[in-house]
Amino acid sequence: MLKQNPPYREWGLILMKFLASIDVMPIKEILDPQGKAVLLGLKNLDIQGFGDCRIGKHINMEIEAADKATAESIVEDACKKLLANLIMEEYTFELTAI
Amino acid sequence: MKFGVVVFPGSNCEDDTVFAFRHNLGQEIVKLWHKDHDLQGCDFVILPGGFSYGDYLRSGAIARFSPIMNEVIAHANKGGYVMGICNGFQILAEAGLVPGALLRNIERKYICSNIYLKPQSSSTLLTAGLEDRAYKIPIAHGDGRYFADEDTLKQINDNDQVLFRYCDESGVICPEANHNGSIENIAGVTNAGKNVFGMMPHPERASDEALGNIDGRFILEQVIQVLA
């Protein structure tokens, strides 16, 4: 189960709202055929200068928590358990207060 | 011996699986709804092909958290038999019940065609009794490129956990026969306990004479011959 955000509202606490900006990318050991196809397309368009190209996912999610550290630990948990498959992907994220 | 096939939203091979086991193999088989928490006394659970939850996020990633998966995982951990075919294999991999992961096919295309498989493991229920020849079985998937890191790969090879490898018509395991770009031509694997089987090809779609190919039936029959 994912970690539950404690029932702060019921306790009368004011929650902070964040935007979690999450990137999920294929790990470097894995060949990324999508990235290769995009490079080929750019070459066909005669747009020059690009090197290695890797394609992943970007996920934006709003999250409410008591503070930034709590929000971070919840997003971390979500990434590990569902948003990324750590056998083939890695993730990074940033939190911005909104 | 009672078989059960789990139906997830977006599964589309559950009827083929029921037909193969009931009509071609004469077995008792029931459908299990993914929201239930009851395996209805099934000894052998099958996760069928399809596109559970529309393949959103990653193939099998959401289905892996369907309510019935708690019971399926508990069944597998107790040594009970579980088999995942195509999307079912992806769900098993996401659940960590079999090693490795399934990536987008190397040529990025969805492949629907007959391919050939060479049985590998001599120590699993599913493959030990098969002949040493190429079996013609259909595949239909976009995310079938098997991947495992170096350590895992060594472990599954050393422990005889590879069920099938893609081969050509004469049984030669070669790069040309590796349609989806799987590591070491791997088409199916089992867990360390050898009671959970995952494979991308569809044996249930090659089980009836009317379809002109019963190589799949020979594979599914293994389970019955040993357990019945």
Model-derived features with residue positions:
Chain A
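Residue-level detector of alpha-helical hydrophobic segments embedded in or interacting with membranes
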Residues: 1-2, 28
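Long, contiguous binding/interaction regions
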Residues: 12-58, 62-98
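Short, Lys/Arg-enriched N-terminal segments with co-localized hydrophobic residues
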Residues: 3-15
